[in-house]
Amino acid sequence: MNFRQRKPKAKILVVDDEPHNLDLLYRTFFQNYKVLRADSGPEALEILEESGEVAVIISDQRMPKMSGTEFLGLTVNKYPNTIRIILTGYTDVEDLVEAINSGRVFKYVTKPWDDDELKALVKQGVDTHNVLKSHTEELRRALQQKSLLYTVTNTIRSAPDYQQMLQRIVESIGKMFEVSLAICRPV
């Protein structure tokens, strides 16, 4: 038997204070994505805190308690790779331009939206998120390697004798790879 491991569905978060729109967004995306729902910015922040990073956030702009751009702005530092899409039935030009220019919003879509266009936009957002995550991980690994090389070089230069140099190198490598014990033994 050939069992293929299924790739987990990308997570998206939809935020709208109108139950009909929230349900419509859920039904549009649930087959292809794991869809999380919130009816306000504060609730969406709680959901993100519980479930972690999502690939795409689709948020209504005009909501009580917190606007869409305010909510999305609060997610930027903690979830920098998340793609943010704003829905609006109104033209809050100043807010939208500021949000887009500051990098908080990937695209904005006017209500009523075209399902096919929104699906294509979310797919593009998920793909972009995956590329960003991959590049971020590559950069993290490269930085870790450079840091290790720097640490080993400094250890070699500062160690008073060969045995201490080897022990410090092993300890440095152990710290870098987050192991609980690193031992240097002669063979």
Residue ranges and their predicted role:
Residues 52-58:
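Active-site beta3 strand of CheY-like receiver
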Residues 69-70, 91-107:
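Alpha4 helix (beta4-alpha4-beta5 surface) of REC/receiver domains from two-component response regulators
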Residues 37-47, 68:
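Helix N-cap/capping motif at the beta->alpha junctions
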Residues 16, 60, 88:
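Active-site residues of response regulator receiver
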Residues 159-187:
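Helix-loop-beta substructure at the N-terminus of cytosolic sensory domains
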Residues 63:
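Receiver (REC) domain active-site loop signature in two-component systems and cognate sites
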Residues 94, 113-122, 126:
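C-terminal output helix
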Residues 1-13:
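Non-catalytic signal-transmission and effector/linker regions of two-component phosphorelay proteins
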